[in-house]
């Protein structure tokens, strides 16, 4: 490798081309050949085998056991809200109020969303957001009136007169 570098340096004019260099390179190659042959002989020699006695083997009594502290689980939101005490009513004015709806629903609080004060396009966007929110958290969404919706967490059962939505009510959810 040094020979190639040296030749490159001579070619580029960074080093002088010595005649002595060629004899040094031949001596270096001979030394390298002798070293490589010695390495080959060492590789061929079998490695010494070490015997393992049963006395030095691992015993289970020597195993270290760290002290374990049990971790108490926090009560889930379902257990906390089993005695439902709160329902949030939100009258959004713009799509920016979606954060408030999402945070309340995520905390397990049923939300009544009244979009009567919103424009048609923003109301559709907010209903679409709410439908995705309810789907992601496994809840349900129901229409109370034309522009009022109830978002219920999965553990809340809504009992009403008419369980089946008519085609006209279902068409509002169809965004296509």
UniProtKB/Swiss-Prot annotation:
Query: Which InterPro entries does this one have?
Result: Cell_div_SepF, Cell_div_SepF/SepF-rel, SepF-like_sf
Report residue spans for region: Disordered: 13-65
In the record, biological process GO terms are: division septum assembly; FtsZ-dependent cytokinesis
Please name one Pfam family that this protein belongs to. Answer: SepF
Q: Where is the composition biased (Basic and acidic residues)?
A: 17-45
Report the Gene3D superfamilies cross-referenced here: SepF-like protein (3.30.110.150)
Indicate where this protein resides in the cell: Cytoplasm
Instruction: Provide the primary localization.
Output: cytoplasm
Q: Which GO terms describe its cellular component?
A: cytoplasm
Q: Which UniProt keywords apply?
A: Cell cycle, Cell division, Cytoplasm, Septation
User: Self-association or partners: how does it assemble?
Assistant: Homodimer. Interacts with FtsZ.
Assigned protein family = Belongs to the SepF family.
Main role? Answer: Cell division protein that is part of the divisome complex and is recruited early to the Z-ring. Probably stimulates Z-ring formation, perhaps through the cross-linking of FtsZ protofilaments. Its function overlaps with FtsA.
Q: What is this protein called?
A: Cell division protein SepF
* Organism of this sequence: Pseudarthrobacter chlorophenolicus (strain ATCC 700700 / DSM 12829 / CIP 107037 / JCM 12360 / KCTC 9906 / NCIMB 13794 / A6)
